From Swiss-Prot:
Protein name: Neocarzinostatin
A GO molecular function held by the record: DNA binding
Domain of life: Bacteria
Gene Ontology biological process terms, A to Z: defense response to bacterium
Alphabetical keyword list: Antibiotic, Antimicrobial, Disulfide bond, DNA-binding
Family stated for the protein in its record: Belongs to the neocarzinostatin family.
Gene it is expressed from: ncsA
Keyword field contains Endoplasmic reticulum: no
Amino acid sequence: AAPTATVTPSSGLSDGTVVKVAGAGLQAGTAYDVGQCAWVDTGVLACNPADFSSVTADANGSASTSLTVRRSFEGFLFDGTRWGTVDCTTAACQVGLSDAAGNGPEGVAISFN
């Protein structure tokens, strides 16, 4: 089965809310970066490395951690290029998990008050 992610809560968020991020169907024993990102252009994802968290999937391919989400953040591309300020009240922000190769479940959309 394809890997899945859940974020609780995922809507009605305030700046600095701590959400629970869980993954299932992940590669057992693989480390995943957990972070908040936004599609800022077609195929371009800018993320917030300042609040990244890391988690390793257990033998069943499950993982869970907490993450602080921001209404706006300093966005960086995967190659480390600074994108600029991302405002989640206008951008499509999400929380996701990805391994070192960029593989992981689809990101979960989040929304702020």
